[in-house]
């Protein structure tokens, strides 16, 4: 199983370093913003194993409904984890 995790991590790293904003039709977006949004799509694809999910997430230069859903899904996942944490008092 660790080999699978390594391959997923490697593919995410390669996809982040190989793509540039103009490759997917994004103009007027900073490199930092592009990298942040692309990392979000990569995380979403990694966590939810969607076939072709990253392409749908990147569509319309990260302004489509799929990207927004991905962000909400990732944020909800983090919120659920926070709810289970008991205070240390």
Swiss-Prot record:
Gene3D superfamilies linked to this entry: Crustacean CHH/MIH/GIH neurohormone
InterPro entries for this protein: Crust_neurohorm (IPR031098), Crust_neurohorm_sf (IPR035957)
Disulfide links within the chain: none
Domain of life: Eukaryota
Biological classification of the source: Eukaryota, Metazoa, Ecdysozoa, Arthropoda, Chelicerata
Full protein name: Alpha-latrotoxin associated low molecular weight protein SGV242-280
Signal peptide feature range: 1-18
GO cellular component terms, semicolon-separated: extracellular region
A Pfam entry, by short name: Crust_neurohorm
Keyword annotations of the record: Secreted, Signal
Organism listed in the record: Steatoda grossa (False black widow)
Location of this chain's protein in the cell: Secreted
Described function: May increase the toxicity of alpha-latrotoxin and/or other venom components. Is non-toxic to mice and to the cockroach Periplaneta americana.
Family of this protein: Belongs to the arthropod CHH/MIH/GIH/VIH hormone family.
Tissue expression as described in the entry: Expressed by the venom gland.
